[in-house]
Design a protein with these regions (language model features):
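N-terminal chloroplast transit peptides
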Residues: 1-40
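Extended, non-transmembrane interaction/recognition domains
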Residues: 128-261, 265-266
Length: 314
């Protein structure tokens, strides 16, 4: 079985977006819930069920979502206002299912929004794709990179991992940016750790644009264990390597978000906004516009994608 992806991105899937009516981006001022209340709500949602994942894959997702909830939670994030029919959705036959959880940042927070999702797509040829995604986007008031985690199970013995802090500046023109967010944080050691495993190989996206967006320390790899231990070895790699590495990179990113950060002037802010908008628009165009209606039908696709476009503000 082969998997071909153009751009794993900060969208909840590797499908598509249509021209849909734009929703107001005004963010409702819900009363802030305690961290425990927020955890109870998200744990009771379809998102945290992960019915199709192996234990190590599920534990990795729970770790990352819990880290966001615990450390950002009430001080930075509004409660999710995703409608119930978008929080969990499926096609008519139930062969394609998905969840979507989004929390936008409060006005005073550098967080624009955080997003978590999973997709289960049964294939006509047999088997299924299971796509899990967690993303954190920042406002233009800071130049902190965006966070992106995506783990795709193409088969019990074949995974694709995309884990990166996505740069928001051209690193060639901004060597200080490279030093602050990538060299001083020693992100390269995580990529090198995975690279030492014989089952892990670099994954080259068919999209040249995507390759340009990824940072120098970005992890874009395939994990293939078709010889010997097979599925058991895949689970071991997730448990012993992918999970701790993902947790460490999430911790580094959250530390950046809640730290003092870099004061961004008006001119630089406009440049950041333009770059962020272009990346979001391209991600929607490449990953969402064509395949989601095929997988879920037009009505479901329009409903889900309308919410995504609203949050992306594109």
């Amino acid at each position: 079985m082969s998997c071909t992806f153009h751009l794993p991105c900060a969208c909840p899937l590797a499908p598509a977006i249509l021209l849909a009516p734009k929703i107001s981006r005004a963010r409702p001022s819900f009363p802030c819930r305690s961290s425990m209340e927020n955890q109870q709500l998200i744990r009771g949602s379809k998102l945290m069920g992960f019915p199709y994942l192996t234990g190590p894959h599920r534990d990795t997702m729970v770790d990352l979502i819990s880290a966001m909830e615990n450390r950002l939670g009430c001080h930075h994030l509004l409660p999710s206002s995703v409608p119930p029919d978008v929080e969990h959705y499926q096609n008519e036959s139930g062969t394609s299912q998905g969840t979507l959880h989004i929390r936008c940042g409060i006005d005073s927070s550098p967080i624009d929004f955080v997003l978590a999702s999973w997709l289960h797509l049964e294939l006509p040829t047999g088997g299924a794709l299971d796509i899990t995604n967690i993303a954190g986007y920042l406002k233009s008031s800071t130049d902190v990179p965006h966070f992106q985690f995506e783990l795709v199970k193409c088969s019990p013995t074949f995974l694709i991992l995309f884990l990166d802090l996505i740069p928001r500046k051209d690193i060639v023109f901004s060597p200080d940016y490279l030093k602050t967010y990538y060299e001083d944080t020693q992100l390269e050691k995580f990529r090198q750790r995975l690279d030492q495993l014989p089952e892990v190989q670099a994954y080259f996206s068919s999209s040249l644009y995507f390759r340009r967006v990824v940072s120098p320390t970005g992890i874009v790899v395939s994990i293939k264990c078709e010889d010997g231990a097979g599925p058991e070895r895949v689970e071991e790699i997730i448990r012993e390597h992918v999970r701790p590495i993902s947790n460490d990179i999430m911790r580094i990113w959250i530390d950046m978000c809640v730290g003092d950060g870099v004061e961004v002037g008006e001119t630089e802010r406009a440049v950041l906004e333009k770059r962020d908008s272009l990346i979001k628009s391209k991600a929607i165009e490449m990953d969402l516009s064509s395949s989601m209606p095929k997988q879920f039908g037009q009505e479901v696709a329009d409903r889900v994608l309308r919410v995504i476009k609203s949050v992306y503000n594109v």
